[in-house]
């Protein structure tokens, strides 16, 4: 895509500069461009706030993932039919959400287990961290904290949560997640990060990319459309929030804050993708009520 970017990537080059050609490329062949999102995140536990308060959970006692076992035991005793910790049969598993390793594109071939202090590529699956974490999660599965059908579950965690069947999940914390989660599920979350500093790894720029198909009938036009989206607040708002006046209303134009119209909630909204981090450029779109302007 380097030639297409040089010719049509006006917005892309404004955002990334010449570094756009240094990511997602092999031997100088650029196969995609990264989306514009927060790069750093911190593994954290997200718990339904109403249940944390109901069972008097002291979040100050939660310092690391293993501390959640006592919490699960307490909440499960009062909510026996509820899943304590979300997991699915794809990459959205507790283990993957807790990992701070840099898989360098594919952890199967090796990873940086301590990227801030070492550039040594190690066997991810033979690491002490992997063994300890997998053992802990297996124990939780045996105790019923993780759903017995996790290996075949294809439901998104938001669907399970909106149905009232989920207490918590491990997820990457960044400033936008509290508002994003509440607006998409209808629940407030108590969040406990497990580290003080966020991490940035290779997937931060290659986890979600946008490309022009090799067999595109008109790659030039495809590139122009892609570049346009990166610079268009109107398109970004349409993709992420839907139609103004129907799916959302602007509450604070100066700070770009929106909310549901009267009578609309997370349960009955006609459209609310609310995953700007999956789209080309969330920084130019509106922010949901409760976000830091």
Where are these regions (language model features)?
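Extracytoplasmic/secretory soluble proteins
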Residues: 1-293
């Amino acid at each position: 895509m380097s030639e297409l970017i040089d010719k049509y990537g006006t917005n892309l080059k404004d955002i990334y500069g010449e570094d756009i050609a240094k990511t997602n490329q092999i031997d100088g062949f650029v196969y995609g461009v990264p989306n514009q999102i927060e790069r750093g995140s911190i593994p954290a536990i997200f718990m339904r706030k109403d249940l944390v308060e109901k069972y008097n959970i002291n979040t100050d006692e939660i310092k690391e993932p293993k501390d959640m076992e006592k919490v699960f035991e307490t909440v499960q005793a009062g909510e026996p039919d509820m899943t304590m910790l979300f997991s699915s049969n794809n990459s959205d598993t507790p283990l993957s959400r807790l990992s701070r390793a840099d898989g360098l594109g594919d952890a199967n071939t090796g990873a940086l287990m301590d990227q801030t202090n070492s550039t040594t590529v190690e066997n991810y699956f033979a690491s002490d961290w992997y063994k300890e974490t997998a053992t802990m999660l297996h124990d939780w599965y045996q105790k019923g904290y993780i759903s017995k059908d996790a290996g075949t579950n294809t439901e998104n965690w938001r669907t399970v949560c909106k149905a009232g069947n989920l207490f918590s999940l491990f997820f990457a914390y960044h400033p936008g997640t509290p508002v994003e989660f509440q607006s998409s599920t209808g629940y407030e979350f108590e969040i406990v990060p497990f580290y003080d500093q966020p991490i940035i790894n290779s997937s931060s720029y290659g986890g979600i990319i946008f490309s022009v198909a090799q067999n595109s009938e008109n790659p030039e036009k495809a590139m122009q459309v892609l570049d346009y989206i990166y610079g268009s607040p109107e398109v970004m708002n349409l993709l992420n929030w839907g139609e103004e006046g129907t799916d959302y209303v602007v509450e604070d134009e100066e700070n770009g804050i929106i909310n549901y119209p009267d009578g609309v909630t997370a349960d009955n909204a006609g459209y609310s993708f609310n995953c700007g981090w999956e789209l080309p450029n969330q920084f130019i779109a509106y922010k949901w009520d409760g976000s830091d302007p």
